[in-house]
């Protein structure tokens, strides 16, 4: 996935001088041992580095200030090995502007009844120290994450790893730049929003560029590059001409590849990580980008149709959380309301992300009833089965809300010979009726990001970091 730097996390262990140098030495050794084992576990997507034992307000504050100014540090993990007077943490914690995880753990996972004494108690009093430390975080009204359990347990490691992905996404969010080629679809409400507030809250920069600026890039692509990509993609996808003659099919597919290479070069040259198109404004383009948009999403770029910059940025954000695994721009289209079959069929005109494909996508060319352009090439496939989340962001004037529900993904019950697009079937775990009523009541949009790799706990953590309301429909 393009343009995600190598991040790391710092580990700061709480203690105090009261216990003497030998105990502090042991605290550091234990901390380094835990970090070594965590890094070796294979459950963490980013490495942890030991930073310091926090024993005074001064050295804790210095560590947090250094974390702020080290761009390679995505967050800080803390643990109170011994008792750690929480007043020492106040200033440093106030200054920290990186994500914070409090790991409430213990060096050993048991109580050594046959050998325990007060020396052991002084060294291993995380149950005591973590409460003191957690209090000051609560008192400061922090949006920090708490993970409780033994550090060697896989479930704890997985939870830390998922939080790491959220923390990195939070840091990267302030680098997300969205280009809108033309404005949003005319007269549509939910795709609109306050771009200034979005930049304040999420760090998203949203810029308008005319389609003519894009056309210049598209027309400048070398034919040889298109020909090479056309051959390369035949190993990845099935090329199905169908009712098209071979000349038309090849031309229309290659034009989408021209658009793909042109848009990608534009995004790369100007530092954008997400984009939108609008079928109402395609002057100078032969086709609405379909296959082109799908290939760019597969590369990790965010996308949404009809100028929906919020969903384009959200899709990019969740692709960072998920490492671009099974995370796609989506739209609710039509319903199955029969008892025992309740489901939503999600799709879009063309642009569904192939990272959720369950079968080998087919490159097909078919007419498109809107846009007034040539028949666009697109990837056609069925989505996957399994647990997923469907997520949207809506702007209510006084606040943004992150809205989601858990869903069960399924494949369509039958083929759709007259609907040659990629599609995904799902049912809200709350039930179609309760899920739909909840979504409609809170004002969730019709454009979403559907992810089989992100969960509601991570969405909760994201909302907490950004300081926005999270509505999890159950």
From Swiss-Prot:
Cysteine pairs bridged by disulfides in the record: none
EC number of the protein: 5.3.1.4
Keywords, in A-Z order: Arabinose catabolism, Carbohydrate metabolism, Isomerase, Manganese, Metal-binding
GO molecular function, a single term: L-arabinose isomerase activity
Cofactor: Mn(2+)
Free-text remark on how the cofactor is bound: Binds 1 Mn(2+) ion per subunit.
SUPFAM superfamilies: FucI/AraA C-terminal domain-like, FucI/AraA N-terminal and middle domains
InterPro entries named among the record's database cross-references: Ara_Isoase_C, AraA_central, AraA_N, AraA_N_sf, Fuc/Ara_isomerase_C, Fucose_isomerase_N/cen_sf, Lara_isomerase
Gene3D superfamilies per UniProt: 3.40.50.10940
The keyword Cell cycle appears for this protein: no
Pfam families in UniProt: AraA_central, AraA_N, Arabinose_Iso_C
GO biological processes: L-arabinose catabolic process to xylulose 5-phosphate
Keyword Secreted appears in the UniProt entry: no
Domain of life according to the entry: Bacteria
UniProt binding sites for Mn(2+): 306, 331, 348, 447
Involved pathway(s): Carbohydrate degradation; L-arabinose degradation via L-ribulose; D-xylulose 5-phosphate from L-arabinose (bacterial route): step 1/3
Record field: catalytic activity: beta-L-arabinopyranose = L-ribulose
GO CC terms, sorted: cytosol
Entries under HAMAP family matching the protein: Arabinose_Isome
Purpose of the protein: Catalyzes the conversion of L-arabinose to L-ribulose.
Similarity comment text for this entry: Belongs to the arabinose isomerase family.
The protein's name: L-arabinose isomerase
Organism: Leuconostoc mesenteroides subsp. mesenteroides (strain ATCC 8293 / DSM 20343 / BCRC 11652 / CCM 1803 / JCM 6124 / NCDO 523 / NBRC 100496 / NCIMB 8023 / NCTC 12954 / NRRL B-1118 / 37Y)
Gene: araA
């Amino acid at each position: 996935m393009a343009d995600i730097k190598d991040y790391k996390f710092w580990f700061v262990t709480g203690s105090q001088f009261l216990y003497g140098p030998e105990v502090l030495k042991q605290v550091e050794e234990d901390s380094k041992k835990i970090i070594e084992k965590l890094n070796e576990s294979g459950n963490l997507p980013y490495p942890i580095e030991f930073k310091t034992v926090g024993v005074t307000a001064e050295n804790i504050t210095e560590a947090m200030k250094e974390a702020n100014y080290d761009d390679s540090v995505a967050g800080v993990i803390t643990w109170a090995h011994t008792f750690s007077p929480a007043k020492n943490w106040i200033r440093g914690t106030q200054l920290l502007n990186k994500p914070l995880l409090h790991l409430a753990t213990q060096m050993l996972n048991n109580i050594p009844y046959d050998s325990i004494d007060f020396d052991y108690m002084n060294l291993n009093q995380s149950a005591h120290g973590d409460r003191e430390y957690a209090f000051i975080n609560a008192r400061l009204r922090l949006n920090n994450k708490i993970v409780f359990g033994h550090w060697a347990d896989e479930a704890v490691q997985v939870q830390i790893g998922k939080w790491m992905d959220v923390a990195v996404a939070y840091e990267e969010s302030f680098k997300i730049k969205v280009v809108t080629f033309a404005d949003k679809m005319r007269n549509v409400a939910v795709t609109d929003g306050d771009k200034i507030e979005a930049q304040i809250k999420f760090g998203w920069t949203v810029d308008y560029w005319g389609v003519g600026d894009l056309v210049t890039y598209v027309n400048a692509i070398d034919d040889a590059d298109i020909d090479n990509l056309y051959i390369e993609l035949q190993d990845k996808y099935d090329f199905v001409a169908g009712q098209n003659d071979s000349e038309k099919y090849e031309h229309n597919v290659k034009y989408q590849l021209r658009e793909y290479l042109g848009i990608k070069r534009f995004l790369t040259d100007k530092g954008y990580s997400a984009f939108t198109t609008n079928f109402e404004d395609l002057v100078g383009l032969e086709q609405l980008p379909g296959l082109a948009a799908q290939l760019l999403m597969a590369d990790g770029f965010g996308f949404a149709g009809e100028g929906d910059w919020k969903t384009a940025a959200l899709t990019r954000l969740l692709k960072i959380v998920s490492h671009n695994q099974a995370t796609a721009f989506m739209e609710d289209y039509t319903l199955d309301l029969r008892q025992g079959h309740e489901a939503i069929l999600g799709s879009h005109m063309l642009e569904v992300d192939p990272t959720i494909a369950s079968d080998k996508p087919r490159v097909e060319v078919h007419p498109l009833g809107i846009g007034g352009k040539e028949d666009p090439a697109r990837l056609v496939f069925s989505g996957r089965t399994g647990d997923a989340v469907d997520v949207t962001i809506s702007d209510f004037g006084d606040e943004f809300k992150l809205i989601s529900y858990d869903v069960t993904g399924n494949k369509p019950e039958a083929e759709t010979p007259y609907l040659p697009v990629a599609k995904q079937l799902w049912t809200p775990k709350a039930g179609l009726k309760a899920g739909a009523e909840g979504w409609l009541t809170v004002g969730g949009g019709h454009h979403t990001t559907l992810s089989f790799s992100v969960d509601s706990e991570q969405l909760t953590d994201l909302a907490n970091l950004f300081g926005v309301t999270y509505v999890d429909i159950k």
